[in-house]
Regions:
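Extended beta-strand/beta-hairpin segments
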Residues: 1-48, 58-80
Length: 80
């Protein structure tokens, strides 16, 4: 389960996963929308999850097939 917590003070949201000791991650919105612009926006976090999934899947197949690589980079962008 994912837990997202926010306070009245600002629009920063803290997200944690209930799988033991994991680091929390945060989201925020731009200053002009009332946030602090201290963390990624929610849409960027969603896009990051997709990019991480693609990156891990690519490396999984490279490892499975015994292909040599130094790193895998995924770049993603979204239109608003």
């Amino acid at each position: 389960m994912i837990t997202v917590t926010g306070t009245r003070e600002n629009y920063i949201a803290e997200m944690t996963a209930d799988r033991g000791t994991l680091n929390a991650t945060h989201c925020d919105i731009p200053v002009e929308q009332g946030g602090q612009n201290a963390y990624m926006r929610p849409g960027e976090t969603l896009l990051s999850a997709l990019g991480a999934c693609m990156n891990i899947t690519a490396r999984k197949y490279l490892n499975r097939d015994g292909l040599d690589y130094e790193s895998v980079t995924v770049k993603a962008e979204m239109a608003r």
